Amino acid sequence: MGGEERSGDGEKRGEEVVDAGSLFVLKSKGTWWHCGFHLTTSIVAPALLSLPYAFKFLGWAAGISCLVGGAAVTFYSYTLLSLTLEHHASLGNRYLRFRDMAHHILSPKWGRYYVGPIQMAVCYGVVIANALLGGQCLKAMYLVVQPNGEMKLFEFVIIFGCLLLVLAQFPSFHSLRYINSLSLLLCLLYSASAAAASIYIGKEPNAPEKDYTIVGDPETRVFGIFNAMAIIATTYGNGIIPEIQATISAPVKGKMMKGLCMCYLVVIMTFFTVAITGYWAFGKKANGLIFTNFLNAETNHYFVPTWFIFLVNLFTVLQLSAVAVVYLQPINDILESVISDPTKKEFSIRNVIPRLVVRSLFVVMATIVAAMLPFFGDVNSLLGAFGFIPLDFVLPVVFFNFTFKPSKKSFIFWINTVIAVVFSCLGVIAMVAAVRQIIIDANTYKLFADV
C-alpha cells in the first residue's frame, strides 16, 4: 500500500494485516472529496440546531466567542491529529483507529481501557440519540399531516430504526461516500431553512419578544454557562478522525487537510447562521431544537407554512440516518474483527450471515433504548462531556507532543499543553453539570414517554 503498512489490532502475515475490521470496514480507497463528505456528516449534524439554545445561557458576546473558539480549537486539534497520523504513515505504520494511536503513542493500556471504551460509548450514544431525534422529527411530520393523530413517539423511533437497519448493512465506511455527499446537501438545506425561518419569524408583527437577558440565580447561571460550552464543544465533536482518515487511499499526505477545509467551510456556513439567526429571533426563549420555536405556543399554530415544517423535518431525518450510520462504523469495525474470517471473501456466506445478524442486533438494541428513554439527551450530555471533549480537544494535542516532542520552550508545546489542561477541566465541570441536570430532571423521567 504505497510503502505504508496498515496497523490494526490483528496479526500480520508478511505485508498483509489479518484483521477483518481493517480489511472489510476501513478500506483505504477514498479521495479527499470522500473524506470531506465523511467529515461533514460526522460534524455538521442536526446537533447544530441546539446552538441558539446554548447562546441563551451565554449571551451574544460569550456565545459568538465560544463558537469561534470551538471552530478554531477543533480545526487545530484535527489538523494535529491528521499530521500525527501522516507522520507515522511515512515511517511505515499507518494507524487506522483511535485506539491504535493510543496503543502505540501512549501505551497499550491507554488504547484498551480508556480510548477504545469511551470512543465506543460516544459512537453508540450518538446512534441512540439520533434514533430518538429521528423519531421526534418523524412525529413532527406526522402531526403536520394528522394534527389529531394518536401515534406515540416510540412508534416513530421504531420506524426510524427500520431505516437505520437497512443503512447499517452497507459493508464499509468507503461505501457510504454517496450517502454522505447527499448528507452534505441535506445539512445545507435544513440549516438554510432554519435560518430563513428564524429571520422570517423575527420580522413578523406577532413575533416573540426579543429578550436576551440571562435568567436564573447565580448557581443556575454558572452551570448554564458550562452546560452551554459543553453543548458547543460536543456540536463540534467528531471522535472518529483516525477512522475517517483510514478511508483515504495512499499516499495520504495533504488529503485530510483538504477534507478538513471543505468540512469547515460548511461548518462556518451552517453553525454561525443557525446560531446567530435563531438566537436573534427567539432570545432566551430558544429551545433545545430550534424547529420547536416555529410553533406559536399561544395559538398552537406555526409561524411558517406547515409544508415548510414537513420539509425541514424530512431533511433532518434523512441526514440523521446518515450521521447514525457513520458513527456505527467504528462499532462495525470491532464487530467485524470478532465475527468475520479475514481469510474468506468479504461477501462469502461465512462472513455475510454473521455480519447481517450482529449489525442488525446492535441497531435493534439502540432503537429499543431510544424508544424506552426519550430523556436520553440528558445522558448523552454526560457522554459528550467525558467522550467528545477528551477525544477531540485533549488527546490530539497530547498525541502530537508525544510524537514530535517539541521543545518545552516552544510556543506549540505550551499552546498544546494549555489546550489539554483547559479542556480537561472543562470536561470535568461539564460532567458535573450533566449529572446535576440528570438529577434535576429525574422526576420527569418515564419509560416510553410520549414527549
UniProtKB/Swiss-Prot annotation:
Q: Where mainly located?
A: membrane
Question: One of this protein's Pfam families, by short name?
Answer: Aa_trans
**Organism whose genome encodes this protein:** Arabidopsis thaliana (Mouse-ear cress)
Protein name stated in the entry = GABA transporter 1
What are the transmembrane regions? 35-55, 57-77, 115-135, 153-173, 182-202, 222-242, 262-282, 308-328, 356-376, 382-402, 411-431
Q: Which cysteines are joined by disulfide bonds?
A: none
Q: In which tissues is it expressed?
A: Highly expressed in flowers and at lower levels in roots, leaves and stems.
- Give the GO terms filed under biological process for this record: gamma-aminobutyric acid transport
Q: Which GO terms describe its molecular function?
A: gamma-aminobutyric acid transmembrane transporter activity
Activity across pH: Optimum pH is 4.5-5.5.
Give its localization.
Cell membrane
